[in-house]
């Protein structure tokens, strides 16, 4: 288990795109049987994020590190007054240590500071530990559908957290 010596930093450093993309590809394949499509989707989104960050558009990334190794990440993009939570992942050895909660709190705090209307996220039903974190943070599942984007059949979920009226 990861202890308090983990740090969370905001911003993109060389190697972060590759590390976050790799974590998604390896962990989702190992834990849920997803194929290369999830990794390709994360890579595409991370490149778009980097472009948005450098052009001054609304985007942010937090990375959890321990001993120089990336053990978690979460991102936010802003689209029309709505924050979209992206790339939330925590390495198995860092789970149940508070890292996930700290990452999620950082991302939601960013959206609140920007006075955004709500935070939206898309996930898959097999990620029950993540769903627990979302519920504790005040998110509600607003829809679900069966999809085949990442594998033969998965339940895809949309969650929202309303930040103001």
Where are these regions (language model features)?
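C-terminal "cap" of GNAT-fold acetyltransferases
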Residues: 2, 13-16, 117-165
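Acetyl-CoA-dependent GNAT
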Residues: 6, 10-93, 101-110, 114, ...
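Flexible nucleotide-binding loop
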Residues: 97
């Amino acid at each position: 288990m990861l202890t308090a010596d983990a740090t969370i930093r905001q911003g993109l450093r060389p190697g972060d795109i590759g590390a976050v993309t790799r974590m998604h590809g390896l962990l989702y394949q190992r834990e849920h049987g997803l194929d290369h499509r999830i990794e390709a989707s994360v890579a595409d989104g991370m490149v778009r994020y980097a472009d948005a960050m450098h052009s001054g558009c609304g985007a942010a990334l937090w990375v959890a590190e321990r001993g120089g190794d990336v053990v978690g990440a979460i991102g936010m993009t802003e689209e029309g007054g709505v924050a979209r939570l992206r790339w939330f992942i925590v390495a198995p050895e860092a789970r149940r240590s508070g890292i996930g909660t700290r990452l999620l709190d950082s991302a939601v705090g960013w959206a609140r500071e920007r006075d955004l209307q709500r935070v939206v996220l898309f996930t898959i039903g097999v990620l029950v530990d993540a769903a627990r974190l979302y519920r504790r943070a005040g998110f509600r599942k607003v829809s679900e559908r069966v999809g085949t984007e990442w594998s033969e059949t998965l339940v895809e979920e949309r969650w929202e957290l309303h930040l103001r009226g």
